[in-house]
From Swiss-Prot:
The chain crosses the membrane at residues 30-50, 59-79, 104-124, 127-147, 155-175, 181-201, 222-242, 243-263, 283-303. It is found in: Cell inner membrane. This is Protoheme IX farnesyltransferase. Carbon 2 of the heme B porphyrin ring is defined according to the Fischer nomenclature. Converts heme B (protoheme IX) to heme O by substitution of the vinyl group on carbon 2 of heme B porphyrin ring with a hydroxyethyl farnesyl side group. Pfam families: UbiA (PF01040). Belongs to the UbiA prenyltransferase family. Protoheme IX farnesyltransferase subfamily. NCBIfam families: cyoE_ctaB (TIGR01473), PRK04375.1-2 (NF003349). Pathway: Porphyrin-containing compound metabolism; heme O biosynthesis; heme O from protoheme: step 1/1. It is a multi-pass membrane protein.
C-alpha cells in the first residue's frame, strides 16, 4: 500500500527511545493497512471457516509480510532522507533528523527483509516469498529510486507494488495466484492515484519544495482534481467486480455502492470547487473507503 498517508505515524513530542526510532522507520500504520489487505486475501482464499493449521499459516504469513513491508519503509527513509527533511509532513522522521545513520538504517532494513523472507520461504511457501520480495524491490527501488523523482505518473506505475498485499495473502494460503486475487489487486491499484493525489493537492507546497514531479506541481491543481474524479469513476466499476464474479453477495454490493458513490461525490465536489479542506476530506474518505470496503468483503464472505 502507498506511504503517503500522513497518519502513518506522528511526530514525537519528546526524544524517542532507540526502539521507537527504529519502529517509526517501519511506518507502522501504513504497514498495518498492508497486512490488513493481505489478510483479506488470505481469508477470501479459504472457502470455509479456517482450521487451526490455516489460522497458524495466516499468522506466520502476516508476520513475514509485516517484516518485509517494514524493511521497504525503512529503505524508503534512507533514499528520501533529504526530501523528508524539507517537508513538514516528514521532517520528524529519525533519518530526516539525523537521529539514525544511513548504514544503521540500511542494516535494519536488510535484517527485516531477510527475516521476513526466511519466514515466508520456510514456513509459508516459496511463491509468497518471491512475490513479497518482488514487491519490496518494486516499492523500494523501482518506485522510490527510479519513478518517484522521474515522472508525475510515478504513483500510477509504482502503485502496482502497493496493490500486491491481497495477492500475497492469496498466494500464502493457496500457493497460487487466482483471478480473485487479481480483482483485489485491481481495486487497490485504481484506488491509489485518487487517494494519493488528494493528499498531494493540499500538500503541494511541500512537494514543490522537495523537487519531486508530483502531478499538482507539474500539471496544476485543476488537472489533478479532474484526474482524481475520473479515477473514482473507474474505481467504482472495479469495486463491483467481486459481486459480478461471484466473490461476494448483496451485503458487499450495497456497501461497495454506498462507499463508491461517497468517494465519487467527494471527488466531484473537489473538482468543481477546490479548497484544502475538501482535498483533506477526500483523502480521509479514501482511507475509509478502502478499509470499510475490504471489511465488508470479509463479513460477506462469512456471514452471508
Amino acid at each position: 500500500m502507498n506511504p503517503s498517508n500522513p497518519a502513518a505515524s506522528a511526530p514525537h513530542s519528546r526524544a524517542p527511545s532507540r526502539f521507537a526510532q527504529f519502529y517509526a522507520l517501519t511506518k507502522p500504520r501504513v504497514v498495518q493497512l498492508i497486512v490488513f489487505c493481505a489478510l483479506i486475501g488470505m481469508v477470501l482464499a479459504v472457502p470455509h471457516v479456517p482450521t487451526w493449521p490455516e489460522v497458524k499459516l495466516a499468522l506466520i504469513a502476516c508476520a513475514g509480510i509485516w517484516l518485509v513491508a517494514g524493511a521497504a519503509a525503512a529503505f524508503n527513509c534512507i533514499v528520501e532522507q533529504r526530501i523528508d527533511a524539507r517537508m513538514r509532513r516528514t521532517a520528524w522522521r529519525p533519518t530526516a533528523k539525523g537521529e539514525l545513520s544511513n548504514p544503521l538504517t540500511l542494516a535494519f532494513s536488510a535484517a527485516l527483509c531477510a527475516a521476513g523472507s526466511v519466514i515466508l520461504y520456510v514456513w509459508v511457501n516459496p511463491l509468497t516469498m518471491w512475490l513479497t520480495f518482488a514487491t519490496f524491490v518494486g516499492y523500494a527501488v523501482v518506485y522510490t529510486v527510479i519513478l518517484k523523482p522521474l515522472t508525475p505518473q510515478n504513483i500510477v506505475i509504482g502503485g502496482a507494488s502497493g496493490a500486491m498485499p491481497p495477492v500475497l495473502g492469496w498466494a500464502a494460503m493457496t500457493g497460487t495466484v487466482g483471478p480473485e486475487a487479481l480483482i483485489l489487486f485491481l481495486i487497490i491499484f485504481l484506488w491509489t492515484p485518487p487517494h494519493f493525489w488528494a493528499l498531494a493537492l493540499y500538500r503541494v507546497e511541500d512537494y514543490r519544495k522537495s523537487g519531486l514531479p508530483m502531478l499538482p506541481v507539474t500539471h496544476g491543481n485543476e488537472f489533478t482534481r479532474l484526474q482524481v474524479f475520473l479515477y473514482t469513476l473507474v474505481l467504482f466499476a472495479a469495486c463491483l467486480m467481486p459481486f459480478v464474479f461471484k466473490m461476494s453477495g448483496w451485503l458487499y454490493l450495497v456497501v461497495a455502492v454506498v462507499l463508491s458513490v461517497g468517494f465519487s461525490w467527494h471527488a466531484w465536489r473537489l473538482w468543481r470547487s477546490y479548497s484544502d479542506a475538501l482535498a483533506r476530506k477526500t483523502f480521509r474518505f479514501s482511507l475509509i473507503h478502502l478499509s470499510v470496503l475490504f471489511a465488508a468483503l470479509l463479513l460477506d464472505h462469512y456471514l452471508v
